[in-house]
Structure formats: C-alpha cells, structure tokens
A protein has these predicted regions:
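A short acidic-to-branched-hydrophobic micro-motif
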Residues: 89-120
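Long, charged/polar, surface-exposed segments that mediate recognition or autoinhibition
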Residues: 108-133, 192
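N-terminal targeting sequences that direct proteins away from the cytosol to non-cytosolic compartments
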Residues: 2-89, 96, 131-137, 142-145, ...
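Extended beta-strand-rich segments in extracellular/periplasmic secretory proteins, especially
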Residues: 147, 151-153
Length: 204
C-alpha cells in the first residue's frame, strides 16, 4: 500500500509541474477511470477539411503538423522541486475564426518513465481539466497513436469545447488539440480528425 501511495504522489508531482499546478488531491481511481468519447477523434467524416492548411515542420523540433496559418511559439521553463533542473515547455498555437489550434510539449526526465505511460497520460489529463476551473471532462480513452502511447480527450468550459490527444514519444509528452464553440462540434469534427492525423512525431 505504501508503494501505491508513493506512486500516486509522484504522479501528482509530475503533473503539477507539467501543467502549471492546482490545489487539491485525487483518489487512486481518478487516474485510471475512462469515459467513452462521444465521437472518434481519428475518423474523418464529411465536411470541410484541412486541405488548405500549411505544413509546419520546424528544423529545431521533432514533429511536423498542419496549421491553418503560421503559429505563434511560447516557451517556458518549469522548476523541478529539490532539483537544479527545469522542465522545458513549448507551445505552438494559432487561431482560425473561432477555433484555436495548438500543439504543445514538454520533455520529461528519463527516470520518470518508470511510472508507466498510462499513469503519466491519465494523470496529466486530470490536472489539465482540474486547472480549468469549471471545466467538465466529456470523455477520455487510452489509445495508440502511430505506435506511441496516447490518450484521447474532450472537455468543455462554458460555450467552448476542447478535443485532442496526448501522445508520449519516448520521454516527450505532446498535447495536440483544437478548441472551438460547443455548437460547432459537428462542423469541426472533420478538421479535428485530419489535424490530429497530420501530426507526425519522431524520437529525434
């Protein structure tokens, strides 16, 4: 039991660092429970796609993806408690009408991977939603994205909904998502599926 409590504490510590920190605690089942998503994020349907979006393939990064226009880059460093090291955080984001399209990532210390991909992915998602006060998790589901461990998610806050996937590539944790008005879910679905599919990570 002691080992289980410690691993949960370690996961909370990891996710607090990764996504900005929150006040609160979680029971063990909160990290393993899944909720079915209302639609398949990886299945494109009829409707407008991303054919006119531009390929974003920066030389300094280990991924490529398609954006509706040139994204802005935000870079931060999060301090690791009791360590001189920091976690780098990068986000590439742009807007297209009422949609916000984003790819973000951080690089984890190698020894954190011993806690397992599912624990890292689900814990990170829990903290992401909890950090957005008033947000509701519609669904989350573990998956495999192009051979990498992944977690699909959908949550909403007010009249805005966000859907996407977390992908763990080696020790790099990516978040690929689109935020859009709730009433436009059906119209955005095709673009969302194609945007996620356009994401091509590599281990560098």
């Amino acid at each position: 039991m002691k080992g289980k409590k410690f691993s949960i504490f370690k996961l909370i510590l990891i996710t607090l660092i990764l996504f900005g920190g929150i006040v609160g605690s979680y029971k063990a089942y909160d990290f393993v429970r899944e909720k079915k998503l209302p639609f398949d994020l990886h299945h494109a349907t009829g409707g407008p796609g991303i054919e006119k979006w531009i390929k974003f393939d920066p030389k300094e990064e280990n991924f490529s993806v398609r954006f509706p226009n040139a994204p802005k880059h935000v870079e931060k460093d999060f301090p690791i408690p009791r360590s001189d090291d920091t976690l780098p955080y990068h986000e590439y984001q742009c807007s297209d009408n009422e949609m916000v399209v984003s790819v973000s990532y951080t690089v984890l210390p190698e020894d954190w991977l011993k806690w397992g991909s599912k624990m890292i992915l689900k814990g990170a998602m829990k903290v992401v939603v909890a950090q957005l006060k008033g947000a509701h998790l519609v669904g989350q589901s573990t998956n495999t994205f192009k051979s990498y461990p992944a977690l699909d998610f959908e949550h909403y806050l007010g009249d805005k909904e966000t859907a996407g996937t977390l992908v763990l590539v080696g020790n790099t944790l990516y978040k690929v998502e689109i935020t859009y008005p709730v009433h436009e879910r059906e119209q955005v679905h095709n673009k969302l599926a194609q945007f996620i599919e356009s994401f091509e990570p590599s281990k560098g």
